[in-house]
Swiss-Prot record:
InterPro entries xrefs: Ribosomal_bL28 (IPR026569), Ribosomal_bL28/bL31-like_sf (IPR034704), Ribosomal_bL28_bact-type (IPR001383), Ribosomal_bL28_sf (IPR037147)
Organism, scientific name: Hydrogenovibrio crunogenus (strain DSM 25203 / XCL-2)
Keyword field: Ribonucleoprotein, Ribosomal protein
Entry's Gene Ontology cellular component terms: cytosolic large ribosomal subunit
GO molecular function, one term: structural constituent of ribosome
Family indicated by similarity: Belongs to the bacterial ribosomal protein bL28 family.
Signal peptide: none
HAMAP family for this protein: Ribosomal_bL28 (MF_00373)
GO biological process annotation, one example: translation
Name of the protein this chain belongs to: Large ribosomal subunit protein bL28
Gene name of the record: rpmB
């Protein structure tokens, strides 16, 4: 399963670990992904999404129906 938020599209970015002596080694910064089930009243079913915590806040703000409509408009299968 890929580490990409289904709502925001956030994915891992690459950076450096920097030691006290300023030696740099490559590392990945992973998004804070959570699997969450949402009840969709219009469809009378649960929808399971893998999303970042900022994606959860977007759903809290805009509502699950409007977010699902945007995802389907992008061509994502939900």
């Amino acid at each position: 399963m890929s580490k990409i938020c289904q709502v925001t599209g956030k994915k891992p970015v690459v950076g450096n670990n920097v030691s006290h002596s300023h030696r740099k080694t490559r590392r990945r910064f992973l998004p804070n992904l959570q699997t969450h089930r949402f009840w969709v009243e219009n469809e009378n079913r649960f929808v399971k999404l893998r999303l970042s915590t900022s994606g959860m806040r977007i759903i809290d703000k805009n509502g699950i129906e409007s977010v699902l409509a945007e995802m389907r408009a992008r061509g994502e299968k939900v």
